[in-house]
Structure formats: C-alpha cells, structure tokens
C-alpha cells in the first residue's frame, strides 16, 4: 500500500525542497521558466546511481560507484538548465556546510566538512529564455526549503519539463511493504519527467505508466475521438536533449552494492511509463538513497554464495520499479500548462 503521503518523504529522514522562477507570460524562447529540486537527508544516506540515457548531464556520479571510497551522500540535486544548471549544486553545498552537514575532515574543527551532493540535469533551456537557468542561489534556497511536505507538477526542476509533446513535471509515489522478507519497509520515488518519448498511448489517451496498476486506479478513462485527434496532432518534441531523472529512497539497511542494484531495477518503471526510454536523446538517471532506519527481519537461510539480504532486496527492487512508474504518472497528471505547452489534464479532462 502507499505511504501516508504517497511521496518520497514517506521514507523517514528524507526531505524535499524546490526553488524556481516562472513568469506568467513565459513562452518557448522568452521569460523565466526553470528551477531545481533538492532531496536532503540530514545525517546522510547510503547512495548509488544508475545512468542509462545516452545524453546524461551529471555531477559526482563517479563517487557513488560501489568500488570507490565514499559510501554516503548528504543531498541530491535535480535541476533544469542542462549542464549550466549543475551550478546549483554549489549552493546546496554552501547551505550544507553552513549547517555542519558533510564528511567531517578535521576532528579539531567540526566546521570543516565536505558535503557530498551528486546531481543530474534535464534539458529545459528552450522553455523560457535560454539564458535564464538555475544558479547556486537556486540550490541554496531549495536546500533551505527542504521539508516533509512539498508540491508536485510544474514546480522546481519540473517547471520547464516537457514529456514528449505535452507538459512534464515532478511526481512522487511510495509503497509500504505489508508482508514478505521486507515487511514494514518503505520504498518511494520522486521523478522529473522530461522525456523525448511519449507518456500516453495515442490509441486511447491512457498513460503508459497506468498499465501495471490499471487506469481505473488513477481515475483514468479512454479519451474521446475528438480529444485524441487534438493530442495526436501536437508537434513532436524537437529538442536534441531531454531526460527523465529522479531519486528512489528506502529506509532499508542497504550497502552500496545493493543500493546500486535497486537503482538499476528502478529503471524498469521508467521504461514502463515512457516510450521510448533510455534513448540517445535522453540522459535518464536514477539515484538511490538508503537511510537504513528500518530493522531487517531475520532472513531465511540461503546458500553462502548469496548475500544475506537477497530476498529483501528482491522485494525492494520490485517495489522501486512500481514507485517510479507511479511517480511519472503523478508528474504528468499534476503538471499544468505553461508557455503554450498543453498539459495532460488539459488535453484529457475526463
């Protein structure tokens, strides 16, 4: 079942903050329409990442390789602005440093810390003025605003997002596992949907990501012929770069190898919700944050060649893919039209 908020912050200790600029009269090519989103974990969390798109824009992803030394991250940045937007991470680091968060590097001076802030970008530069993109100040403000409750849709990193021919945005979903090896643990996702691919079936208007749960779960019904004619006549998204990015969080006690496997499997949800996914024109990237606050149940005996948390991880992986799929559905349904880019709920109001 879903968590209390059906959001990433159903995982205890995970906070989300946005900062964006959006002019009411923004168009494709003019005005302000971009932003960033920060996922902050006070005390840090085991972190991993899986990059599957052909055109990624990332920061500090190498540090999350399980072969490398650092095991934890303090925050994750999701941002618009393409590669320029990575500057927002400087502001996130500044806020964390001011608040004593990061790897302590000097036992004699606790203020000497190095915050670990991996991040990824979407390409939203054509929406609004090309020269208006997230700066360090955006990241600082988003980190400061991070809280349990947050908005979805056309906010933060989702302001300039487009999903194929329609408006993209930010969405979230969570699952609290009720039984099995991972009973009582929570898995959740937050996704920024900005793919070159389509998020809805041109034959029915139903979202691809509603397939696992069924359209009725989301209150969706097939579109009318008139609605389909309008939606299918929209011009194909013509940008060279695009990208869907996000974060999966869990309270499970995972090591970096298990977290990496969780990130890998989470991409299955992305592939269910977007067609095509992981294209040469997308930089699809999913981070994982594992806080480890949940208690792992006693594991059944397994052959010594297997990790002891194998069955727990298997259940978490299944849930992560579903959360990503649902979060993308939430992003599309929550988005509102800006800059002349129609939203899903505007095209299919039924």
Which positions does each model-derived feature cover?
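A structural signal for small-residue-enriched, beta-sheet-centric alpha/beta enzyme cores
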Residues: 1-90, 94, 98-350
């Amino acid at each position: 079942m879903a968590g209390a908020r059906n959001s990433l912050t159903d995982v205890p200790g995970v906070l989300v903050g946005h900062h964006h600029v959006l002019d009411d009269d923004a168009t494709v090519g003019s005005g302000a329409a971009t932003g960033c989103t920060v996922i902050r974990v006070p005390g840090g969390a085991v972190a991993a990442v899986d990059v599957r798109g052909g055109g990624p824009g990332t920061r500090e992803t190498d540090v999350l390789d399980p072969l490398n030394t650092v095991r934890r991250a303090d925050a994750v940045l999701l941002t618009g602005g393409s590669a320029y937007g990575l500057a927002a991470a400087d502001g996130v680091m500044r806020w964390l440093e001011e608040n004593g968060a990061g790897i302590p590097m000097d036992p004699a001076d606790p203020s000497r810390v190095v915050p670990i802030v991996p991040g990824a970008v979407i390409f939203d530069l054509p929406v609004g003025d090309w020269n208006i993109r997230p700066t360090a100040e955006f990241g600082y403000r988003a980190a400061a605003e991070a809280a349990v409750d947050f908005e979805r849709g056309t906010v933060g990193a989702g302001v300039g997002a487009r999903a194929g021919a329609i408006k993209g945005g930010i969405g979230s979903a969570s699952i609290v596992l009720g039984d099995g090896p991972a009973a009582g643990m929570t898995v959740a996702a937050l996704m920024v949907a900005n793919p070159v691919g389509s998020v809805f079936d041109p034959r029915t208007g139903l979202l691809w990501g509603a397939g696992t749960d069924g359209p009725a779960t989301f209150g969706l019904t097939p579109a009318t012929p008139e609605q389909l004619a309008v939606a299918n006549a929209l011009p194909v998204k013509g940008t060279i770069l695009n990208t869907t990015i996000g974060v999966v969080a869990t309270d499970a006690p995972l090591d970096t190898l298990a977290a990496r496997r969780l990130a890998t499997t989470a991409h299955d949800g992305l592939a269910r919700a977007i067609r095509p996914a992981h294209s040469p024109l997308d930089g699809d990237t999913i981070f994982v944050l594992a806080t480890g606050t949940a208690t792992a149940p006693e594991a059944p005996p397994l052959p010594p060649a297997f990790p002891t948390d194998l069955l727990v991880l298997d259940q978490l992986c299944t849930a992560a893919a579903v959360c990503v799929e649902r979060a993308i559905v939430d992003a599309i349904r929550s988005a509102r039209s800006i800059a002349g880019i129609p939203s899903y709920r505007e095209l299919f109001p039924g």
